[in-house]
Amino acid sequence: MGKPIVAIVGRPNVGKSTLFNKLAGKRIAIVDDMPGVTRDRIYAEAEWLNNNFTIIDTGGIEPENDDIIVAQMRRQAQLAIEMADVVLFIVDGKQGLTDADREVAHMLRKASKSIVLAVNKIDRRQLDDNIYEFYNLGLGDPMPISASQGLGLGDLLDEVIEKFPEGNVEEEEDEYIRIAMIGRPNVGKSSLINKILGEEKHIVSNIPGTTRDAVDSYVETEEGKFVLIDTAGLRRKSKIKEQVERYSAVRTLASIENADVCILMIDATEDIAEQDERIIGYAHEINKAILVIVNKWDLIEKDDKTMKNFKDKLRTKLSFLPYASFLFISAKTGQRVHKVLGMAKECYGNYCKRIKTGILNDIINKAVLMKEPPVMGTRRLKIYYVTQIGTKPPTFVFFVNDPELLHFSYRRYLENKLRESFDFSGTGIKLEFRERKE
């Protein structure tokens, strides 16, 4: 299962963003300049007592206001509530209970979500009595907090994580490889999923934005069991006219976090765009297995060098992904579509790969004999041994005399030796260096 999602909702000016910033701290998890996300600070990672979760800040809900922008903000909040595992409903303890609070409470009850009610702006003990009128909302015990001063947040977070879904609720999904289809609007994500499923399950249209949210499709084939997640395409900031598009972007990012393999779909008839680089860069940063699919290959005039030249151009553009696997398809004609799940499974297998410690040390010892670490000052890096400490992605710890003696070029050399010796195509690998006294 992915990380739980907590939506912070309430009418305007009750302190939602203050609470969001307090919970997020400096742990904003989105790469800079992501469309409508980082700049607006609506999506971040938080942690409490070793429980990691995602928080979403929403625009203020004004139920009776028909202004277009306000209506869009209301729809944003509804989308966030739909996505959430827990809804954190914030009210203003100084202003007291309002009709708008009652309307929001009514909306939340209809959503049938786990709700935690927080009464904000209780900055001193004398104001504690202000919470009691909020029992009238019928949403359980109101919790007094001061987001600006950080008061009561520990008790609040205890209550929030208490309502997280149990980790084994969807245990059967562990058998499934989760694949997120990402890319700009209209590159053929839904068409590819429909081809794989053999049915018109998704709306397929040349109107960008027909996939508003991430949709999961379960499929079992000879290759294995898969969950295919079709996401809304990410656009350039200038094209995000509707406030609702922010939450499509958020949902795409959440889908990447919950995926094992990310498939970036690119239109062969168009150049790779900056937003393609950004979104797959995010998948790379959080260490997902990656497959790049070039769709609409049937529309390209080809000779025997076309595919190689196209792949070389992509490798240059995506230079931070030297390990990515590539596949050229046509979702429309079905060309090479039968290879998609097989290649995704290979990427996933490499993502989960474990190497025995003895074999690992043989490879590294030979690599050191072939090329000694460079001398820094009067000292040379010594590698005592290496062991694998994790998967998804494969993570290796090198125990050395002093990590400060490691030059970036030698780190790259060691990673290349591991990749030459073991197939890690389609996945990043992590190398850590720790000091061990002789």
UniProtKB/Swiss-Prot annotation:
Question: Which annotated residues bind GTP 2?
Answer: 183-190, 230-234, 295-298
Where in the numbering of this chain does the KH-like domain appear?
353-437
Keyword Repeat included in the entry's annotation: yes
The EngA-type G domain covers which part of the protein?
4-168, 177-352
Binding, GTP 1: 10-17, 57-61, 120-123
Its keywords, alphabetically, are:
GTP-binding, Nucleotide-binding, Repeat, Ribosome biogenesis
Instruction: Spell out the InterPro entries in the cross-references.
Output: AAA+_ATPase (IPR003593), G_ENGA (IPR031166), GTP-bd (IPR006073), GTPase_Der (IPR016484), KH_dom-like (IPR032859), KH_dom-like_a/b (IPR015946), P-loop_NTPase (IPR027417), Small_GTP-bd (IPR005225)
Which molecular-function annotations from GO does this UniProt entry contain? ATP hydrolysis activity; GTP binding; ribosome binding
Q: Which GO terms describe its biological process?
A: ribosome biogenesis
Belongs to which family? Answer: Belongs to the TRAFAC class TrmE-Era-EngA-EngB-Septin-like GTPase superfamily. EngA (Der) GTPase family.
Function according to Swiss-Prot or TrEMBL:
GTPase that plays an essential role in the late steps of ribosome biogenesis.
Q: NCBIfam families from the xrefs?
A: GTPase_EngA, small_GTP
Q: How does it assemble?
A: Associates with the 50S ribosomal subunit.
Q: What is this protein called?
A: GTPase Der
Native organism is Clostridium novyi (strain NT)
